[in-house]
């Protein structure tokens, strides 16, 4: 999509830019609802691709998959033991065992070509095809074999330990509905049904860039006042973790023209655009101005949340029309806002019908938790199993939104709602579970 930039900002860079007109900050819940409702409905004809089953792990089905086979494919044994005719053994027990002639051995993968006659049994192994005439399996622990005869030491149930053909599903049965994520169990089902390829939604393309004159790449020597751009690495890892394809646009300086060119390229090549930095109200935060000049509708400019107050959410009027998510610049705030808002968008846009929403659980807090109560506050830490119950342990050290060191082992975020300033040790707290 080629957009003519009408975003020439010719003012003196030291002249204060117009501030956004005051609008009340939406709550975190309202913000999430607004963002999630912006995710477009996928087209199962256009937004898809065919992949081999070997490459399908983590992908999302675009269409239902029906079985072409009965499963099991044939009557087979669920145990190592003896295939028998129930009418021969229905009165057998340990005190008066029935004796049967063992006429064959049936290993797995062998097709028996005989019929069990009255008074006969066949040694059989788990998964092996039942012989004609046999309708019950007696597990070997309930038998005693002497030479070519077997003694049945129990009273079996009719049909016991026999898996009947098509007992699990018949040819034509829907195995998996559309919008199912394919993991090990789902792939096993498809493989057992001889399904070599599947139609899946293509991976969402996510453009990522960072803004700021102070940013440098990790291979550049640091000068006073400079910091390494860690956000792009973190966001790319999170995007991949959620089944999407990151497209990296690097570092963009605090220059309206450069920023406009980058955003134009990003929205032409991606389904979601994520930027970090440049969305606050400082003199060098240009993102909202550029978006407006490109015709974007800005839905959100900030959120009642700590960390992560600066947040820009925008959409574009003409296709391709990606969702723009402008995150804060501070590294911890980037991660928290990604987990709370961006991750569900990627998963929903990837085709998940359910399971894309954030997962909140209530657990016991091991530590005292504090907030000023002015915004919904997210405190990072980890869940530990203690005496059979999960506890939230607050990460040690500084919880400044610029500090990364204690985020490394985080697997949960404790949530203190707006107006709540304190949760004492041992009390319940709501936590957002994070992907491991």
UniProtKB/Swiss-Prot annotation:
Binds 1 Mg(2+) ion per subunit. GO terms for molecular function: metal ion binding; molybdopterin molybdotransferase activity. It holds the Pfam family MoeA_C. It comes from the Bacteria. Residues 1-24 are annotated as: Disordered. Its EC number is 2.10.1.1. GO terms for cellular component: cytosol. The keyword Coiled coil does not apply. One of its GO terms (biological process) is Mo-molybdopterin cofactor biosynthetic process. Transmembrane segments: none annotated. Catalyzes the insertion of molybdate into adenylated molybdopterin with the concomitant release of AMP. This is Molybdopterin molybdenumtransferase. It comes from Nostoc sp. (strain PCC 7120 / SAG 25.82 / UTEX 2576). The lineage of its organism: Bacteria, Bacillati, Cyanobacteriota, Cyanophyceae, Nostocales.
């Amino acid at each position: 999509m080629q957009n003519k930039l009408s975003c020439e900002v010719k003012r003196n860079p030291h002249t204060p830019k117009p501030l956004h007109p005051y609008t009340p900050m939406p709550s975190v819940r309202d913000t999430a609802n607004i963002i999630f409702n912006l995710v477009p409905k996928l087209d199962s004809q256009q937004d898809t691709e065919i992949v081999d089953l070997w490459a399908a792990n983590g992908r999302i089905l675009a269409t239902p998959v029906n079985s072409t086979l009965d499963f099991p494919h044939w009557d087979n044994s669920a145990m190592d033991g003896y295939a028998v005719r129930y009418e021969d053994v229905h009165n057998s027990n340990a005190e008066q065992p029935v004796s049967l002639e063992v006429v064959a051995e049936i290993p797995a993968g062998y097709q028996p070509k005989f019929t069990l006659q009255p008074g006969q049994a066949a040694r059989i192994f788990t998964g092996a095809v039942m012989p004609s005439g046999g309708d019950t399996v007696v597990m070997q622990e309930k038998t005693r074999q002497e030479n070519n005869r077997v003694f049945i030491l129990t009273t079996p149930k009719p049909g016991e330990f026999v898996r009947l053909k098509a007992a699990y599903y018949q040819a034509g049965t829907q195995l998996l509905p559309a919008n199912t994520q394919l993991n090990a169990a789902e792939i096993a089902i498809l493989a057992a049904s001889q399904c070599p390829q599947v139609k899946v939604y293509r991976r969402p393309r996510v453009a990522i860039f960072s803004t700021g004159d102070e940013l440098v790449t990790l291979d550049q020597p640091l000068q006073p006042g400079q910091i390494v751009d860690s956000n792009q690495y973190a966001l790319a890892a999170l995007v991949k973790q959620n089944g999407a394809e990151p497209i990296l646009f690097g570092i963009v300086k605090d220059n309206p023209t450069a920023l406009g060119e980058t955003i134009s390229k990003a929205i032409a090549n991606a389904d979601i655009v994520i930027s970090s930095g440049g969305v606050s109200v400082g003199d060098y935060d240009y993102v909202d101005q550029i978006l407006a000049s490109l015709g974007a509708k800005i839905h959100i400019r900030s959120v009642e949340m700590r960390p992560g107050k600066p947040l820009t959410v925008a959409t574009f009027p003409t296709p391709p029309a990606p969702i723009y998510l402008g995150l804060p610049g501070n590294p911890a705030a980037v991660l928290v806002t990604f987990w709370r808002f961006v991750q569900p968008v990627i998963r929903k846009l990837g085709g998940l019908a359910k399971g894309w929403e954030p997962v909140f659980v209530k657990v016991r807090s091991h530590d005292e938790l504090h907030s000023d109560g002015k915004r919904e506050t997210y405190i990072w830490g980890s869940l530990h199993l203690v005496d059979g119950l999960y506890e939230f342990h607050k990460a040690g050290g500084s919880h400044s939104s610029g500090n990364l060191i204690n985020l490394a082992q985080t697997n949960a975020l404790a949530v203190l709602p707006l107006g709540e300033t304190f949760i004492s040790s041992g009390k319940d707290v709501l936590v957002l579970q994070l992907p491991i």
